[in-house]
Amino acid sequence: MYVAQPIEWTEKGVVMLDQRRLPSEEISYTYTDYREVAKAIREMVIRGAPAIGVAAAMGAALGVLHSPAKSVEDLRAEFSEICSVLAKTRPTAVDLFWALARMQRRFDELCAKSSQLSDIKCGMVEEAKLVHLEKKATDQAIGEYGAEFMPREGQVMTQCNAGALATGGIGTALGVIRVAYQQGRKIHILVPETRPYLQGARLTAWELHKGGIPLTLITDNMVGHFMNTGKVRAVVTGADRIAANGDTANKIGTYQIAVLAKENNVPFYIAAPISTFDLSIPDGEHIPIEERSAAEVTHLQGVRIAPDVHAAHPAFDVTPARYIAAIFTERGVARAPYSSSLRALAAGPQPAVSSAP
């Protein structure tokens, strides 16, 4: 089954598939400078919390690899600036900060072990590759846990794009769907278009179609109608940040889907890696919500579709934990009360990762 490759580390640099051009064009760019990677994250060449984390790790490694520093101390100072630049790109996706913190820890370990810049550079590149490899294993585990909750047959709704394009593996929400479909479950996916950036229409529909999984594309204002038919058996989405109490930030429009699911007795699930947990914040009120350009609302692929008026564009909303039936992770399934179940999973052992490519 086809699996998209949004990002790869190569000898020539970090290669990213430009997701802004999908589905009409499949164009990739090769980046050799961490500033270019930061710009690619900010401008959504790559998007999706786990994939942003992979990109940040690779950006940090690129910065170290191509640093002109002549000493470890000079490299330390430069690495601080590298992480600062990458950290300013997307404020809501906690995987970004998780990845940078991990790369910082590895950098400190390498500097403590060796004064050879070549050793440090090599170690950072290997760590970035390992982050990507772990994301692939994580997606598979999430998919296997979550698939058990999918119906034997019927409609499953998702939101935005939480597939391979968003993670670098098989996807979180779409990973659950993919594994369930491969198990022989006769599911049909309802894909809201996800205005204003159309990640559902452009990316999720593209991934599912390429993978041979049956789907129907719907507009965002059709969600309630389809819920009310009684044919939707489950909803599964990804997440960009999960607070300690289970409140979850995901792409704008997710909250209203969760409310409609509750009203229509449809279980609403979240599929996300442990790295998306932010147990340092008590609830969703503390999750920063990224405000993107109003032009992404008033224009569609460069064409103005609205008059020259004020437009709001919060990129995410927060779904309260009370609407979430379960959260699928690579270490198992969390259920309410999330304040205890999330911490238990976060403290658990990480599944083993194969070193095979």
Language-model regions: role of each:
Residues 171-182, 258:
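Histidine-anchored nucleotide/phosphate-binding helix
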Residues 30, 34-37, 49, 53, ...:
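Generic structural signal for well-ordered, non-membrane alpha-helical segments
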Residues 43-56, 90, 96, 158-169, ...:
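Conserved phosphate/anionic-ligand binding catalytic regions in large, soluble enzymes, centered on
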